[in-house]
Amino acid sequence: MQRRNKDLTDVYLIIAKNIKKYRRKNNMTQLDLAKKSGYSYAYIRRVEGPSCIKNFSIQTIYNLSKVLNVSIKQLFDESDI
């Protein structure tokens, strides 16, 4: 079970890094992403933060992918992060 939790944490970290990467590629600040997505600035900070426990939903990933103009698949991509 412990290994499974680590694997899940790794997936969340990959997604978080990709959200940050694509946000920056779109020349957006965390505040810009918050405003365009409807999430709070604090929530976006938590999503992107490397040290917090991740628990955002597939719906959140979908919504952020639409704002960032990328596919959900791109947010799960481990290469180039």
Residue ranges and their predicted role:
Residues N69-I81:
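Short C-terminal boundary/hinge segments that cap the last helix of small helical domains
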Residues K17, N27-M28, F56-Q59:
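Residue-level signal for the short linker/turn that defines the boundary of a DNA-recognition helix
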Residues R23, A34, S65:
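The alpha-helix within a helix-turn-helix
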